[in-house]
Amino acid sequence: MAPSIVFILLSTLLRVTSGYVLPNEEGFISGVISDKGLDYAKDLLIEKGIASIVLLQLPEIENSAQVPFVGNAKVVLSNITIKDIQVNSSSLRTGENGFVLVVSGATANLSMRWRYSLSSWLIPIGISDSGTASVKVKGMQVGLTVNLRNQEGTLNLTLLDYGCYVGDLSIKLDGGASWLYQLLVDAFEGNIASAVEEAISEKIREGITKLDNLLHSLPKQISLDKTAALNVSFVGNPVLSNSSIAIAINGLLTARNEALVPQSYQKGLKISSACGGLPKMIKISIHENVFKSASLVYYNAGKMQLIIDELPDQNILNTAEWRFIVPQLYKRYPNDDMQLNISVSSPPFIQVTYQDVGATIFVDITIDVLEDGEVIPVACISMEISASFAVEIIGNNIAGRLRLQKFSTYLKWSKIGKLHMRLIQSLMSSVLKTVILPYLNFKLMRGLPLPIIDGFSFQNANILYIHPWIAVCSDVSFLGDYYLSQQSPYLS
């Protein structure tokens, strides 16, 4: 078989089971595959497993048998090829010991070539012949049990038990005599059955070994850009129930190339499996601390600042436009160009509520006058911005858009005397709505990658707000075999 599909799904689509305690208190992104998701994974696994077996050629079989009144016949079966497999029933069960996949009542069709040579004292001249035959395999059962455990942030996959059993087979000759058919049935039935069983069992071993190697190659950290990296190391062991599989990753952002040291955040203990009554394959939950860690990393790196020297209304960036609002500014710097140096003064405060994501952002806007090539700071206005963040799923990323709720301004310092803040507030409102929020939304719409493997995509995703978690309830669709060639399935 080719079991990689299901177990890649199990190891990368994360956690959400009702009342589950997180596998480890440091897991801030978590999720589960529901029974619907497991059925999808099982069917996809079987489909891909069959594809890997069809056209598989089995080893040549040679045997001899005594034909009554004729003599000894040497028969060789070659080009034994599995043409197709049909599955009648299957099941994927989870339990404390791991995953159990069972396929029962399967049938398979084989093609082969035969040749024989016959000699005896009655027939001094040897007789030989050749032809083709088809084989129908019935009552085939395939099963495997695997265990998935966490070791230092990496998942280890262990094959505990596996096997294939062939119940019955029938052979149809193209050419040959009736005695040869009976000879094939009597002498070769066990050989053909064993060859099928061993070939499928070997495919299972190969698949588990390749998948285990793939799991070991998964990165523990993914660089998002030149500033930040996402900690995707697994925490705790997978939690298996009779209808779902739960796994968690650390999920926090760190400065790029920074050692993966847990940050001090208050831990969430439980999350709900509810998807608002929607039967979805997976549910991925993201703790608000993921967003807080992103806020802290980009703030500490000095990335939350912007210099504005162009505006839709360019007149705002000239002291002449301010002559009635701040006369002393125009008096001291008549008709000089200006720029606005905008910087976030502290890491934005982010909190998931039961309706949306709330954000409080403290911004300092320093007014600079450009005179004779010199940048002259003349005043600083602080703004407290309250906004809501509407989460969206764009491709396989979680992104969103800020919506302004309210804002307030006050004068932080001034070199040009007292300012009339009521008059200035309208100008700041224009800057906020035309520059600051569009700029932030441009950055936010890039989003953060959700842990799903290449080749799969979210389908009909719904967003739920369950303080302090954001939950993505979604089905998934399989787009192709791109993932097979990737060493780093998280990357898109």
Each model region followed by its residue ranges:
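Extended, solvent-exposed, non-transmembrane regions
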Residues: 141-143, 281
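Extended, low-charge, aliphatic-rich alpha-helical segments
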Residues: 2-111, 158, 165-492
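Electropositive, elongated alpha-helical scaffolds characteristic of BAR/F-BAR
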Residues: 153-157
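Short beta-strand micro-motifs enriched in acidic
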Residues: 145-151, 390-394
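Mobile, glycine-rich extracellular loop/lid and propeptide segments
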Residues: 126-128
